[in-house]
Amino acid sequence: PRDFDLHTIDLETVACIIVESHTYAKKLKPYTEEFWRNLDMIRIVYDIPIIVDDIFMGGGKLGKFFGWETTSFRPSIFTMGKAITGGYYPLSITCYDDYIDKALGDNFNWDHGYTYSFYQPGIISMLYYLEQLNFDKFDTIQRVVREIFEGHGFEIQANAGLIFSTKREKPFHLIAPLNATGEYYNVLNRTLTNLKESDI
């Protein structure tokens, strides 16, 4: 990944553009609405598919199962992994819009043979994870985790949904679980209480 000036790139030679739904590398700073509007304009004017990498931010960490749904943008193609089973099983998905579907045609063969076949434990782990998601409690989890960190003298430097970047003496990062309960909060509280200043 790199920053670049659009004026130095010949967009006629670009096959696709890949972005994350929310950047981790830039300290969880969200992309602006203007950024997403410009991407959409580039897609329309230059016929460039926009691929959203939702591997890290998907799975509910931002408050929606699909991380890109927290933006105003709809990708041409998006991919997810890891988080779709809560990290319990290596499973990934890739989906695409009607425009890509039309370009592939009716007879496009998705058969990967033995290189990729659906495996029952992977599907079961994803279904179980989906059952655990409770977005009704999302705001509460976010608020309580924030309060626990601040109560232990941590500064919340940034947060994207349930992903927190904090600092006391040193940076400390945490992804809160989507099914956090009182037990989780107690463990987090005890963990932060037991940390020495030299540890953080």
Short names for language-model regions:
Residues 1-200:
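Conserved N-terminal phosphate-binding loop of PLP-dependent enzymes in the Aspartate aminotransferase
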